[in-house]
Amino acid sequence: MIKVDTLINLLKKNNTNFFTGVPDSVLKELSSYLKNQRNHIIATSEGSAVSIGIGHYLSTKKIPCIYMQNSGLSNALNPLISIAHKKVYSIPLILIIGWRGSPKVKDEPQHNVKGKITREILKLLNIKYTILRSNKDFKKFDKQIKHAKKNNTIVACLIEQGTLHKNSRSSSKKDFYSLDKEYFLKTLIKEIPTRSKVISSTGYNSRELMYLRKKFNLNKSKDFYMVGGMGHTSSVALGYSLASKNNIFCIDGDGAFLMHLGSIMTAGNFAKKNFKYILLNNNSHDSVGGQSTNADNINFEKLSKSLGFKKFYSIKNKQNLLKITKNFIKMNGPAFLEVKVTNSKIKKLPRPDNLIKIKNEFMKK
């Protein structure tokens, strides 16, 4: 195991003092360490984080540090290849990558796929990397950073689950809103009509939905759980809704909403009356450490209408919750419902595992 302080000190020794990225459960101790620091920006997507880092280098000539989960490496490929690559603008960057699905760690199916090819992706990009497992690995990483500085190239380190020591700056997640998320979801799935379809986003949303279905035997509608593809739930829901007469309910989170905001605009402008979008807004990246998304600063009523949605609803407490939920369900879409909720309170949430069965059940008419 390694301490976050040791990693940060190595970076600072190499004159790297700027950090940006997308929160990851493997790297949550790093996020906790960087919390509230002026030289740290939580980006909405990995590509955005890389681009922010590029801008920092162009202004300061100092190499930035960009962190992400390896599942988000695909989002980062465009600016990494078309801007920062040695054969393009040759901009030095330091990548810290949380390595889900590494060969030494048992993980979920979607992470196993990406974990297996992560090193090959870095090799294809000619990015030198170090697997950080203990303090002895810092010597190699330090050499690679110095090489990156000298030759204006990109360098990376891979960090596996459980590698980072819990640091003294770690803090428990705090709720920004008071409405219990489980209470709303239970109410929603009780009211959703038979033959309706639900597509829910990655993270806790899908796992909570699956848990509540089973616990209370609420299985009259079918769900598709987005175990990956953060930010793409609304697009999958849109594609389904355009070819179906069934009502489609898209359950999303604020972090995912912001990651690919343009997709919501597409849904608002092209969806039919059977499309219902539900934003569970807890103002945090709940499943990866509770870091703030700053979604509390957004007026979702004005935003949703400017993105093409015909109707907006809002729920922030139990008062009129059932009435508003019923009205939202009955309303012709595309309709948008923002629900201000707490972080997840359910312990030991199950994970979708038999994914082919889930897909086949969902596709039944």
Each model region followed by its residue ranges:
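Conserved thiamine diphosphate
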Residues: 105-147, 291-327
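Glycine-rich beta-alpha junction loops
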Residues: 24-26, 100-101, 159-165, 202-206, ...
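A short, conserved beta-to-alpha structural element at the edge of catalytic cores
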Residues: 150, 272-293
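Thiamine diphosphate
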Residues: 29-98, 207-282
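Active-site diphosphate/adenylate-binding microenvironment
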Residues: 3-15, 169-230
